[in-house]
């Protein structure tokens, strides 16, 4: 208890590396690889336990108790992680070589397209150096076949993009090597690296790889950080085409042979529209247009979400949205209170041209102007904008929210003495 975990990540890995399964079946289903987390050296956190109401813990009805968890903190000991493979035919377990260093992370394991070889992601404690190991599962011997370093840190959200093609010769993935999130392809034999997409915008996700036609489908914030387009390009970087038509946020899921895809679209003021298209973008049919929801919303006194930008005293342009009360008019002498909402966490995005409807709309109905501003440190504006907060969390994000409040206070229809701010999670830390 509280020492060894097999195949399920510990708290740090689940929370910070965003995965909950630490095992992988081989392509031929004859081997299973997993991570073993040894928490023996991790210090514990003791929590007082009481009876309570929901749930009611009757064992603590008379006397409170203590429950202990392994809870690593920054600068303290982490779990020691090792990687193992079990062969169902030989019934043998083989430990894989991840190097001598124990104070490191193994944020992912993934089988290559060859069931004889496992790929292990090895990340240093500072999270600025990533190495991909190729191990022969039978011997456990490993070699580094890809490495990447970053002057700030490597974003763990990109780790899931790494895909081994079925031909066994290439690997496609996303990286910030040129300062923007883009798609790359590695030749596994020559180790030559080829950049597939480029430009001063961020790709958001790889949606699928059509190996037969040598094409990759992806989601990009190409026209604006607020938008998402569905695009396709050749793996050689030629023939880039935008498939989505409507401005806003588009996402897609493809059929197994890439003949068709389901596109999900919305914008800030329109709920989801789900459609089927042929691979070239041609519309086949509408699956859901949310007409009933739109009719219901029309019965309420809702107002449109409007986007705006403003420039801070440091010359930084920031994006925001505003929801105004139903009786709002810039020409009136009336001044409105402002409710600012924000999250502001690293690489997050709250200001996007996508559908959402919550209690902020209710506040606007009751006379408040609701405003959200994405400051420095948020996503889809390039690496420099996103990672400016590195090693100084809370500094620039706070300054930008203060700048936003001052900007709002300068508007003729805002009551500058009645501006409040709310945040949740990281946003609560900001407040």
Spans of model-derived segments:
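Beta-rich catalytic cores
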Residues: 19-21, 79, 105-107, 128, ...
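Beta-strand C-termini and the immediately following turn/loop, strongest in propeller blades
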Residues: 21-24, 33-39, 73-77, 110-113, ...
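A short loop-to-beta-strand structural motif that recurs across blades of beta-propeller domains
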Residues: 82-84, 131-133, 182-184, 229-231, ...
């Amino acid at each position: 208890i509280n020492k060894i975990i097999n195949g399920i990540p510990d708290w740090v890995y689940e929370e910070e590396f965003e995965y909950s399964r630490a095992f992988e079946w081989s392509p031929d289903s004859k081997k299973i690889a997993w991570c073993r987390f040894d928490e023996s050296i991790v210090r514990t956190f003791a929590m007082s336990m009481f009876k309570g109401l929901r749930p009611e813990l009757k064992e603590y009805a008379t006397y409170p108790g203590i429950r202990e968890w392994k809870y690593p903190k920054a600068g303290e000991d982490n779990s020691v992680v090792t990687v193992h493979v079990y062969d169902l035919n030989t019934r043998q377990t083989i430990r894989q070589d991840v190097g001598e260093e124990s104070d490191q992370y193994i944020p992912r394991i993934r089988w290559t397209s060859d069931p004889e070889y496992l790929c292990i992601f090895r990340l240093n404690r500072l999270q600025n150096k990533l190495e991909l190991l190729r191990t022969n599962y039978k011997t456990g011997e490993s070699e580094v076949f890809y490495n990447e370093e970053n002057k700030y840190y490597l974003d763990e959200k990109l780790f899931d993009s790494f895909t081994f093609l079925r031909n066994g010769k290439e690997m496609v993935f996303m990286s910030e090597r040129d300062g923007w999130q883009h798609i790359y392809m590695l030749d596994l034999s020559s180790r030559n690296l080829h950049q597939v997409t480029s430009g001063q915008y961020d790709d958001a996700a790889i949606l699928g790889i059509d190996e037969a036609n040598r094409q990759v489908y992806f989601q990009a914030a190409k026209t604006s950080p607020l938008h998402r387009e569905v695009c396709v390009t050749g793996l050689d970087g030629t023939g880039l085409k935008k498939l989505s038509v409507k401005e806003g946020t588009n996402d897609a899921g493809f059929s197994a042979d890439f003949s068709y895809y389901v596109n999900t679209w919305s914008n800030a003021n329109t709920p989801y529209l789900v459609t089927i298209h042929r691979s070239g973008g041609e519309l086949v049919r509408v699956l859901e247009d949310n007409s009933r929801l739109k009719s219901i919303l029309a019965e309420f006194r809702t107002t449109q979400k409007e986007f705006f930008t403003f420039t801070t005293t440091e010359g930084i342009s920031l994006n925001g949205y505003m929801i105004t009360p139903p009786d709002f008019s810039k020409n009136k002498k009336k001044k409105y209170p402002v409710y600012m909402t924000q999250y502001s966490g690293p690489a997050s995005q709250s200001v996007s041209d996508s559908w959402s409807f919550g209690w902020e709309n209710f506040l606007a109905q009751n006379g408040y102007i609701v405003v959200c501003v994405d400051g420095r440190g948020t996503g889809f504006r390039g690496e420099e904008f996103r990672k400016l907060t590195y090693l100084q969390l809370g500094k620039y994000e706070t300054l930008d929210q203060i700048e936003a409040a001052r900007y709002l206070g300068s508007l003729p229809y805002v009551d500058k003495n009645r501006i409040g701010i709310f945040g949740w999670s990281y946003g609560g830390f900001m407040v």
